[in-house]
Amino acid sequence: ERTHTGEKPFKCPECQKRFTRDHHLKTHMRLHTGEKPYHCSHCDRHFVQVANLRRHLRVHTGERPYTCEICKAK
């Protein structure tokens, strides 16, 4: 497994950063191309990664999934 060997055979042609998986390189390349395929249906924001869109959607839904360990507020 590449995780344990440190092997990173997929190299970005723009900045030379290396990746263990080809899909990680593909996602990374969006930083260079400016492609933002994930669109918010509530506003005009666009995102490179779907995880960033999911986090952003909390702005619209009011979801606050994390609780403060000290005061228990969300």
Curated annotation (Swiss-Prot):
GO terms for biological process: segmentation. Its main location: nucleus. The keyword Repeat applies. Keywords: Developmental protein, DNA-binding, Gap protein, Metal-binding, Nucleus, Repeat, Zinc, Zinc-finger. Belongs to the krueppel C2H2-type zinc-finger protein family. PANTHER family: MYONEURIN (PTHR24394:SF29), ZINC FINGER PROTEIN (PTHR24394). This is Protein krueppel. It comes from Bradysia coprophila (Dark-winged fungus gnat).
